[in-house]
């Protein structure tokens, strides 16, 4: 649904499903998918060699991780001692689900047709947040696309928290990351993104997100906070009582 009678970005629909047709011999260089979205892909015909890249030490600082992945995306750099790689061979009917910020390259040895799409998930916003941080820090050089629906979707997912199944588990780092992206949207905005406008709805979402962050003890972008400290960036954190955290808003 649109916020305050504004038009919904076409990206809200376009990213949900897409189709790609490639001739044989096409190679897509290493990159991460834009705006920290997860990806699914299904091969309809042909073959895809999908190579996934991982940090040898996921507890490194953000700047160190960024440097390694930035080197990976340099076509002239051939050796990457800080990274490991795994190649998945996808045949017709195979489904690949890729987490946010997963650096990957794709080689198409035969003519191929693939369908897929992008999505956000409450289970992996800790990966979405750092992927969007990488995007902004290097001004979009690590990705091959720009989406304009991200902030609107993230705000909707904040508003949607009270409507989740009460039995659902949410993790601390994941919930913190979602809230931080809503509270500080300009920190994750590329210049080519649509202008961020302050509205009653965005203020409402930011108030909810701020209450959640404060209830969990920060971090308000304090670099000394454990969220930004020496931890594995793929660690979603421990379970949190998210129903208690939003209890004030359940009454509204």
Positions of PLM-derived features:
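Active-site region of the double-stranded beta-helix
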Residues: 1-92, 102-168, 211-252
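Eukaryotic intrinsically disordered, low-complexity regulatory regions
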Residues: 151-214, 221
């Amino acid at each position: 649904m649109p916020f305050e009678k504004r038009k919904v970005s076409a990206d809200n629909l376009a990213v949900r499903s897409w189709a790609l047709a490639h001739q044989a011999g096409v190679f897509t260089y290493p990159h991460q998918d834009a705006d920290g979205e997860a990806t699914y892909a299904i091969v309809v015909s042909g073959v895809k060699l999908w190579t996934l890249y991982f940090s040898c030490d996921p507890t490194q600082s953000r700047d160190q991780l960024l440097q390694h992945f930035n080197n990976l995306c340099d076509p002239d750099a051939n050796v990457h001692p800080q990274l490991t790689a795994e190649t998945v061979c996808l045949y017709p009917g195979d489904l690949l689900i890729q987490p946010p910020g997963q650096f990957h390259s794709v080689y198409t040895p035969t003519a191929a047709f693939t369908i897929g799409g992008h999505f956000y998930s409450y289970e992996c916003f800790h990966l979405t947040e750092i992927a969007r941080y990488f995007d902004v820090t290097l001004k979009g050089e690590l990705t091959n696309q720009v989406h304009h629906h991200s902030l609107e979707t993230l705000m909707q997912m904040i508003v949607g928290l009270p409507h989740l199944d009460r039995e659902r588990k949410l993790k601390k780092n994941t919930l913190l990351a979602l809230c931080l992206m809503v509270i500080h949207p300009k920190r994750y905005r590329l210049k080519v993104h649509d202008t961020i406008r302050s509205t009653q709805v965005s203020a409402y979402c930011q108030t909810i997100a701020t209450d959640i962050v404060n209830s969990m003890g920060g971090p308000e972008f304090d670099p000394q906070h454990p969220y930004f400290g020496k931890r594995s960036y793929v660690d979603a954190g421990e379970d949190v009582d998210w129903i208690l955290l939003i209890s004030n808003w359940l009454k509204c």
